[in-house]
């Protein structure tokens, strides 16, 4: 039995670390709860991206591991569906849609994992499966409504569709935080948070285009995916502090 914490090195008391509280559970070295990346409501996008670079240094596998697990499960399901029902058939299309619904809570679990990482809290692969409970219905209804609303706005023109997508961009993080129990309330909260920040977040996303193009070379994606994932989580964190 270990006598010292594998995170900070302090002596364990009754098997738990008095400093880390979670004993030997993994924790990130983030101190973002104390950091501020905005001034008078203006978000410093460069500072957020620099912080993301700092956090993923020596932690690329930390972010990749849960992402690969989700991708692996998704890939296995896709392969099985194709093998059993054929490719492009009505049956395979229906079963694939059902499989995607099944994977929704796991995608929110992945977001929770990343949020725990950037917040300096304990994070674990089990986070991926923490939403397969009564919140399953909330996640499904919210995702369905977001898809419906975005599609309806897109039918008008491309621009309204983009604006709608930006308005809903914080929904996955809000679902991971679990502070709302109603699908429409989650959607309204995302719209409230993004009010006045849609263009800023759009520009923030555009700033990664160069990195995204590098991913066509395959190897850079090893760095780019964690970088973008953590950067977006940090943006949500800062926006949450601003909006309250």
Label the model's feature ranges.
Residues 1-55, 240-244:
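Low-complexity, intrinsically disordered extramembrane tails and loops of integral membrane proteins
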Residues 8-12, 62-66, 236:
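A generic structural signal for ordered secondary structure
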Residues 13-14, 199-200, 224-230:
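Short glycine/proline-enriched turn or capping motifs at secondary-structure junctions
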Residues 40, 89-123, 150-185, 215-244:
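Selective recognition of hydrophobic, aromatic-rich stretches within alpha-helical transmembrane segments
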Residues 43-76, 122-152, 164-214, 244:
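Interfacial aromatic "cap" segments that immediately flank transmembrane helices
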Residues 65, 69, 83, 87-94, ...:
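Alpha-helical transmembrane segments in eukaryotic/viral proteins
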Residues 74-88, 214-216:
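Juxtamembrane "helix exit" motif at the C-terminal ends of alpha-helical transmembrane segments
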């Amino acid at each position: 039995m270990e006598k010292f914490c594998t995170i900070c090195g302090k002596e364990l008391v009754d098997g738990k670390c008095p400093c880390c509280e979670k004993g030997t559970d993994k924790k990130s070295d983030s101190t973002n709860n104390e950091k501020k990346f905005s001034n008078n409501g203006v978000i410093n996008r460069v500072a957020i991206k620099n912080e993301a670079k700092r956090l993923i240094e020596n932690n690329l596998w930390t972010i990749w591991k849960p992402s690969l697990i989700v991708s692996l499960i998704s890939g296995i399901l896709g392969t099985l569906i194709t093998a059993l029902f054929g490719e492009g058939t009505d049956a395979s299309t229906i079963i694939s849609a059902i499989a995607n619904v099944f994977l929704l809570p796991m995608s929110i679990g992945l977001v929770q994992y990343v949020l725990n990482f950037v917040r300096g809290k304990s994070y674990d692969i089990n986070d991926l499966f923490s939403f397969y409970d009564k919140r399953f219905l909330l996640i499904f209804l919210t995702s369905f409504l977001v898809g419906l609303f975005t599609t309806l706005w897109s039918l008008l023109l491309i621009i309204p569709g983009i604006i709608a997508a930006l308005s809903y961009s914080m929904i996955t993080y809000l679902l991971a935080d679990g502070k709302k129990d109603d699908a429409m309330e989650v959607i309204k909260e995302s719209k409230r948070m993004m009010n006045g920040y849609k263009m800023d977040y759009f520009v923030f996303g555009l700033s990664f285009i160069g990195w995204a193009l590098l991913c066509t070379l395959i190897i850079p994606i090893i760095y780019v995916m964690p970088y973008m994932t953590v950067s977006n989580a940090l943006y949500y964190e800062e926006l949450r502090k601003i909006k309250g």
